[in-house]
Amino acid sequence: MYLQTDRLILRPFEAGDLTRFSHINADPEVMRFFPAPQTSEETAQMLARWADKQTRYGYAFAAVETRHDKQLIGMAGLSRLEDGVPIAPCSEIGWRLTPSAWHKGYATEAARAWLAYGFDTLGLSEIFSYTPRLNLASQRVMQRIGMQHAQALDFEYPALPEGHELRPMVVYRLPSQTYVART
């Protein structure tokens, strides 16, 4: 699956992306709202899971590359959330970019393209996103792309211990009817 926006190319991850994406995932600043930075091996395993989801469902998180210089700046996309959190099963949208790509509108631009693909091409009925309550930047992206906070669905991330600062999660959602009415 390849999508293009004014400034971005959204494409499946390739073998040559592992080193760069591993570097992004190992950055403590990037992973501030995740339990821990990831090793190269963990990143490789994650990419394999995403490739499997792409095969099974026809969509998965994908590479984000800038059009002007073809640099990999992170990931964004849709993924089938199968289990592990109370809102599963559902389709989720997410993003993770290197710090040099922050505050440029790239996450919003990529997410809007993925919403259009999810609703217009895949025919999804609803798309969810979740993030730690502390991650205000991701919540702002969710709001910019038209998602609404579904407070009744907020949850405590089960894989983190009680009292962990990243355990409280906020859930945003966008039903297809709302998306269609806005476009």
Task: Please describe what each predicted stretch is.
Residues 53-57:
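Short loop/turn motifs at secondary-structure junctions and domain boundaries
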Residues 29-50, 60-62:
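Conserved GNAT-fold acetyl-CoA-binding loop/helix
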Residues 1-32, 65-183:
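Acyl-donor (CoA/ACP) binding surface of acyl/acetyltransferases
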